[in-house]
Amino acid sequence: MSMKIIKDSIHGYISLDPIYSHIIDSPEFQRLKNIEQGSFRVLYPAARHDRFIHSLGTFHLATMFAQHFIDNIKEDLGVTITEGSEMQHSITQIINSFCYAALLHDIGHAPFSHTTEKFFKMKTDSSIPVIDMQLRDAVKSVVSEESFQRFDGEFPGCSPSPHEIMSATILITNANNFLGENIANFDLELAARMVIGCTYDYNKDGNISPDEKLILGIKNCLIRLLNSQTVDVDKLDYITRDTQMSGFE
């Protein structure tokens, strides 16, 4: 499969490597073309953009930010990333996971977008919503017991939207179809954390090495760069896109 280049009215040309081209050709991703970005087309008839192009725009910003992020690590922190080193492998996997999460951060949106989102939070006999249990099960299937216990302890402290929980679950459960033989180059739990905005708690690690602390810091920075209460690549795309497509000045 070859690289795709898509012309976007906001960001210009968006390049996708073969692995991401394969993902956007999937039925799961193509359905986003039928889910509008917002519900304001009644007031702004020109605002006909959808979750498909927004996801591509968010991915594009993520790839740009990731490269600058690596450059800043080297320059500002004085980190040496030697070819073939464990540090290089870790950072490459983190960046891959960030781009993967950015592309799929809205894959869990239902028809009518946020309007029907509340129905995701249905419960069974347990007090825990079904989608929360589904995400926990998905994470448990791809990490060690120790890592799962950590996630299970930190997840309740997050407050993700229902569609974010669904997106995080899908990027794990469909990973074999999306990533194929490249799956080992991605940290699926980290990608899920990025989508739901669930950072790692430093206090749970005791006496960790400087390199381990650095890696955790990098992970948390990129988690916030996709899902935060302030500025992130998701907001940067949809604010710019909504403004231009609605004709708002």
Predicted regions: what they are:
Residues 1-100, 108-249:
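Sequence-structural signature of the catalytic-core scaffold of metal-dependent phosphohydrolases
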